[in-house]
Amino acid sequence: MEPRVRTVCFLFFLLRVLAEPAKNSDFYLPGDYLLGGLFTLHANMKGTVHLNFLQVPMCKEYEVKLSGYNLMQAMRFAVEEINNDSSLLPDVRLGYEMVDVCYVSNNVQPVLYFLAQEDNLLPIQEDYSNYVPRVVAVIGPENSESVTTVANFLSLFLLPQITYSAISDQLRDKQRFPALLRTTPSAKHHIEAMVQLMLHFRWNWISVLVSSDTYGRDNGQLLGDRLAGGDICIAFQETLPTLQPNQDMMPEDRQRLVSIVEKLQQSTARVVVVFSPDLTLYDFFREVLRQNFTGAVWIASESWAIDPVLHNLTGLHRTGTFLGITLQNVPIPGFNEFRVRGPQAGPTHQRSTCNQECDTCLNSTLSFNTILRLSGERVVYSVYSAVYAVAHALHSLLGCDHSACTKRGVYPWQLLEEIWKVNFSLLDHQIFFDPQGDVALHLEIVQWQWDLSQNPFQSVASYQPLQGHLKDIQDISWHTVNNTIPVSMCSKRCQSGQKKKPVGIHTCCFECIDCPPGTFLNQTANEYDCQACPSNEWSHQSETSCFKRRLSFLEWHEAATIAVALLAALGFLSTLAILVIFWRHFETPMVRSAGGPMCFLMLTLLLVAYMVVPVYVGLPKVSTCLCRQALFPVCFTICISCIAVRSFQIVCVFKMASRFPRAYSYWVRYQGSYVSVAFITALKMVTVVISLLATGLNPTTRTDTDDPKIMIISCNPNYRNSLLFNTSLDLLLSVAGFSFAYMGKELPTNYNEAKFITFSMTFYFTSSVSLCTFMSVYDGVLVTIVDLLVTVFNLLAISLGYFGPKCYMILFYPERNTPAYFNSMIQGYTMRRD
């Protein structure tokens, strides 16, 4: 025998044994088609099933659960409203049969009763396609554990089951529960609404309390998975003990509650999320009141978010602010009056089963009627819409028109197919089932109020599952000093530009450290590390972005630039005047003794060098860098080489010609002075090319060591080494020129240039060494100014120091600029030597 057949045989036996009549027509309404209803009118949290005695639990022995009766009345109201509506199921009367399931204790017997036929028989068949059970569909029950138990039976027969408040995500599995649908959003939407609420108020440090049943464990796990690696951390999670109604609390349970509340007191988390049925929480909150734990924010799951009995607990308002996640309020016209209507008198229904009585339900409802009326219809609407979903499916299946329907036998699988297709408007809300069998009703965040003139569960925000965020957020009356928003953070939020340094194992616990200058914090990329700014950007301390560094270069509006430019202009004009004077007196001995044609080469190159001075000012470019690194050094080197060669040539004429006549003849014959200058020029050009290849011509930037916000832009990234390399030849030439000039200090006065050459060469040598020294200790834009100033002074030293005295003699002592005077000076020198 197959396992399914053995199971059905056992259930058939159990059904026959447990059937029992009851006298209460409020649970039964005859009709052409019956709906089954499973509601919790009494609650037994332990869920004990007396299989040893084969007895169905007597629900009336347990405490009344007010909300269950309220939901049962909603089903009765919906059925009666449909029966009075001529447009929906015309000429068809819906009936119902409802059973109290005692929360989780009494699930098997009612579902067997609904699956049985009119004779209480559940036949064993191989094919149930043509089987017609007692009811066409089942509404309920309310919690996930009971729904799972019932669905395992009903799915075997494809009997439609619509639950109104079970949110477990496991129920979305249509392979396991093909006949189960829900008129409430799934648990993931409830969890997401909670998370969005905590994110909105920046609560990132929470405590979580869960019940020990499947509901608490599953939802606690879902919340933990949702928060894993996110911005919200769970300080601790505890499991609440499950208490037996109508019995004294066991010592271990009492101690467990005391320990949990003490842990809440000691924790810095001020937000407490509670996943638990309402009945488990009464003793817990009594312990909270006993220990005077106040100032917390309690976030209630949908199972107790609008529980009127818990709300009525004396002194509960002192414990803090209560926020709950629940279904959107949809007013149902006429339901408030129907809810408190007494049961109709009628004869005993012989086919009724057990657990169809609740003698105190109506009185309890009357005592809480004000709260129920003000709190609105939330889960009530889920029951209401579930009944209407079955009615619309039945309307389609029976082929109803405006006046009549074709009454016939309805097989469960046929009705199930039609329920999946329904899409109708009910009180301005569209009802249809998604592929997982859920209706996407909106959720609301409610705050508990204790002002009798207001709604005890005041809506403060709404959540739309399809959009995934809160909206219509209203002000909340916080139970804090000055109505300030409670703070629940392991660590305070870091200020802008501060990185997080983790402390401990929780990502929400950290230290805030300022990002140092030159770095910034990109929170979207990595909030635990400061990133370095790009080389052309900078930042101050504690910044989230970098700014462009100010480029620093020599500009025309600066006083130093203007002063140097005036000196360069003076030098240019002076050199030009010297060139004119030398040109007009070209045939004189003074000009020829100074070098003759070579003087014009030097003066021309000096003019070019003066014209290169402006390229030191302004934003460096490739062209200006080429002039600074190539044109000017070559011009200046030629000038120095001419002076050095001229000094050597004079010494040779007067001191070495007689000793080395052949060498001197070669020097004169082959224009040794010009060859030497050409050779030195070629050598200089080689060094310049090597320097350019090594450093490049593109301007580069470097950080100002005194002010990192400034980027110094220059032509040479390694300007110190480049300067030393480029000036090394010039320094050697200056030393050589100085040496030859010193050797000729005893020459005739008109040929003795030792003082002038010594001045020029010594000035160049000392200024170049000073510039290199200055560069070694300073790295700012002032280096460019000093470099330019030294360059101009060196040019002036040659222009005025070397050529100036000669112009002075030409202009003011023309009698000394004659061949006779020069010959007399040479004869006097010769006579002194002899």
Curated annotation (Swiss-Prot):
GO terms for molecular function: G protein-coupled receptor activity; sweet taste receptor activity. Residues 583-597, 652-676, 744-755, 801-834 are cytoplasmic. PROSITE patterns: G_PROTEIN_RECEP_F3_3 (PS00981), G_PROTEIN_RECEP_F3_4 (PS50259). Pfam families: 7tm_3, ANF_receptor, NCD3G. GO terms for cellular component: plasma membrane; sweet taste receptor complex. Putative taste receptor. TAS1R2/TAS1R3 recognizes diverse natural and synthetic sweeteners. Belongs to the G-protein coupled receptor 3 family. TAS1R subfamily. Forms heterodimers with TAS1R3. This is Taste receptor type 1 member 2. It comes from Saimiri sciureus. The gene is TAS1R2.
